Design a protein with these regions (language model features):
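Short loop/edge segments at beta-strand edges and connector loops
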Residues: 72, 163-165, 262
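Mobile active-site "lid"/loop adjacent to the S-adenosyl-L-methionine
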Residues: 184-215
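Non-catalytic accessory regions of SAM-dependent methyltransferases
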Residues: 1-47
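Active-site beta-alpha loop architecture of Rossmann-like, nucleotide-cofactor-dependent enzymes
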Residues: 69, 185-188, 240
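Conserved AdoMet
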Residues: 30-104
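Residue-level signal for inorganic ion chemistry
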Residues: 27, 65, 95, 123, ...
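Conserved Class I SAM-dependent methyltransferase catalytic core
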Residues: 210-274
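Conserved SAM/SAH cofactor-binding pocket of Class I
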Residues: 97-192
Length: 277
């Protein structure tokens, strides 16, 4: 059977169980290390026994709701490759927008930055790669996540200080920027989360108490002890949380400017607190 027919058959079955049918081609191409042109040229070719087994294995994992990036073992984020597995969330495009915003608003070369809840290290590594003179500290409650983040820093050849910490518990010093993309999904919104996300991605990195606001509240209540006088806070948020977080920040920092910004899909996705009121 030719590759196009094998893919078409499996893709119908994936669609029937609610999975993205194109994920199969995405993973197969990645595992074969083929560019798009080579992949298209192979579509009319007979599938070898070895490749038939590979496709069947990938299909089985996708059908059982394993995310494509976990099967591949990596995700590309902000132009960099990050190893990902079940220890961490898969970095999302919306988070790239947060990184771009921080870089655009902060051209300074000598900032100290803290990334709380670093996960795979996507935010901290991307910032450091673009601002080599910044001193970047990345923390996470999960020791397993930190191990993977360290591997990603090494893979992308950047020097970052990693700290195991529950928010500020083991953090010292003051920072020009504190950024966080913490767990922010409320248990009440569980039905909005994809099946493959619930099946595979770490729950402690997804869900938070207090309608998803618990970790933000922890950070906001202690942030003044760790920010420089002109320090800034950057959060990624759930699309329903913008006004709640704006209220919390305005309450604790009445003299600061607080902005709620939308992502490329028109949803509230970032909250920024800075000194430019």
């Amino acid at each position: 059977m030719i590759l196009a027919d094998v893919l078409a058959d499996y893709e119908k079955q994936l669609e029937a169980v609610g999975e993205e049918p194109e994920a199969l081609s995405f993973v197969y191409r990645g595992l074969k290390q083929w560019d798009l042109t080579h992949f298209v040229l192979q579509l009319r070719q007979e599938v070898s026994e070895e490749d038939a087994e590979l496709l069947a294995h990938v299909f089985s994992q996708l059908k059982n709701h394993k995310p494509a990036q976990y099967i591949l073992g990596y995700e590309v984020f902000h132009g960099l490759r990050f190893q990902v597995d079940e220890r961490v969330l898969i970095p999302r495009p919306e988070t790239e927008e947060l990184v771009d915003l921080i870089l655009a608003e902060n051209p300074s070369t000598d900032f100290k930055v803290l990334d709380i809840g670093t996960g795979s290290g996507a935010i901290s590594v991307s910032l450091k790669k673009s601002r080599l003179l910044w001193q970047v500290t990345a923390s996470d409650l999960s020791v397993d996540a930190l191990e993977l983040a360290k591997e990603n820093a090494k893979l992308n050849q950047v020097d970052i200080s990693f700290v195991q910490s529950d928010v500020f518990e083991n953090i010292s010093g003051s920072f020009d920027i504190i950024v966080s993309n913490p767990p922010y999904i409320s248990e009440n919104d569980k039905d909005e989360v994809g099946v493959n996300v619930l099946a595979s991605e770490p729950k402690m990195a997804l869900f938070a108490d207090e309608e998803g606001l618990a970790i933000y509240r922890q950070i906001i209540e202690e942030a003044d002890k760790y920010l420089t006088p002109s320090g800034k806070l950057y959060f990624e948020i759930g699309y329903k949380q913008g006004q709640d977080l704006k209220g919390l920040l305005s309450l604790h920092f009445p003299d600061k400017r607080v902005r709620v910004l939308k992502d490329q899909f028109g949803q509230d996705r970032m909250v920024v607190m800075d000194d430019e009121k």
